[in-house]
Amino acid sequence: MEAIEAARRVVAQGSTAREQGRSLGAAAKDKIRELYDLKVQQYDAAGALARWDEIVAGAAPLMERFTPHTLEELRGQAEGAGMDEHALLRLATEYEISMDLRGNVSGGKCTGLLSHRLMHRPGVQVIGQNNDENPAVWADGKLDIIVEHRAPPATADDHSGEGGRPLDCVLYTHPGIPAYMGLNSKGLGVTWFYIDDSASERATTAGLPTCVLLRELLTFPSALAAAAWLRSVPRAVPNAYMLADPIQSFEIECTPSRWAATAHPPPEDVSLARPVSLTPGAELYGGFHANHFTVDLENVGNDAGDPHA
């Protein structure tokens, strides 16, 4: 088990996003190339390479404007792996081309939870999710990696506490894809869940890719800052997100044009998120997003969990 975990762990070091990306690309280049070749083979067989490139063409200028950290990291990965930048942009938009090809998809996908203590040292206790995908299209998971992003210590004259350095973080992902879920050094946890269905809108060539959003969210110092940013940027496809730092949690469902969220404690901007419904005297608030129901949620009253689930 230790050997398996060591093989999955990659450390990306550097004082800038570009340097960290270059370090990551060099360390994981064989896995990145293997996954890229696999995905090209899959989408070529589906006759979808041209459509994939259309999605890349739409995403690239949006990344320049809205996700500069992630784009710089991606460029560094390309350099470190000795690959073309376009290949890494393709991997960054893999989820969007996969959704494009699936058409109307419903049910299944990931499940997650968070626990927030309300009394006796209140604060978020845990946030997490599973990754519920078809292993067959991801090399049976053997390429998946845990990435530790590390910046050098701040200098003595760094009065900001960060000095423009990237926040340290640990994240799970497929090699070459910016992020799937993670936790940064400010204690911000980022998770996401599928909510797309036949009635949902998509903007796959006019919005930021999901895995790019996830990586950029991990550059923010708080759940509040991350949620406000996520609401402000163009989003390619519908998703649900759970964001939590040590004192505040957000549960979000959004499409390219619509936004619904709850938060505890609620933000001053009530348009960003409404308060969660709490039981008087409760010591814990538990939120979850479930795509695999084992009970009839319409008939179990208010105890089924979060209303966004």
Where does each model-flagged region fall?
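Gly/Pro-rich turn-and-neighbor structural signature
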Residues: 79, 83-128
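C-terminal, well-structured catalytic/ligand-binding subdomain of enzymes
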Residues: 1-81, 117-309
